[in-house]
Regions:
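Broad phosphate/nucleotide-binding scaffolds in NTP-utilizing and phosphate-metabolizing enzymes
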Residues: 1-180
């Protein structure tokens, strides 16, 4: 797990996918890789502040009364911080890692080249590495657009508004950007 963290966010995302594949790797490895879903080394808070300023066009102190420097969780693409709006409402702010889309696109391109050097295997049940990379990149692209995620939250909330046992997080569109 630590090795994947050191390689960077694309490899963390790959580890997250593998963590769900006990049919491919031993269960104890899956359990360790599950930590990559929320226990990745976080960005320094100073970098979080820069990301927020770039996304909102202003310092976080203009919008938030407070924000906790230590994230609630940190994963391959983003991390989340508990905060309080100036209005007094408690919120969670999700902050995308800086340059993550370019980093992941570059890593995927490099992995595709590397896979091209591997001779094709025809072992029954063997997973095609190109297929894994396609799945990885498709999943990552969906997660990289927080505006699309906001659309999905609103759609889920609307479709399930009459279902007692479901809930969707509140959303503040005025503070929602593609990266925060």
């Amino acid at each position: 797990r630590k090795f994947l963290e050191e390689l960077g966010p694309t490899y963390v995302k790959l580890g997250q996918i593998l963590s769900t594949r006990s049919d491919m790797i031993p269960k104890k490895y899956c359990e360790e890789l599950m930590h990559l879903c929320s226990d990745v080394e976080p960005m320094p808070f100073e970098e979080v502040e820069v990301c927020i300023r770039d996304a909102w066009g202003q310092e976080w102190k203009e919008v938030l009364k407070e924000i906790e420097a230590v994230p609630l969780g940190s994963a391959s693409i983003a991390q989340v911080h508990k905060a309080v709006l100036k209005t007094g409402e408690s919120v969670v702010v999700k902050v995308q890692r800086r340059g993550i889309d370019e980093i992941m696109a570059r890593d995927i391109a490099l992995l595709r080249k590397a896979v091209g050097y591997i001779p094709p295997l025809s072992i029954k049940g063997m997973v095609n590495p190109e297929m894994i990379l396609d799945e990885l990149w498709a999943a990552a692209k969906k997660e990289l657009d927080f505006l699309k995620e906001a659309d999905n939250i609103e759609e889920f909330a609307e479709k399930n508004k009459d279902v007692e046992f479901t809930a969707a997080p509140g959303l503040f569109r005025e503070y929602t950007t593609s990266g925060v």
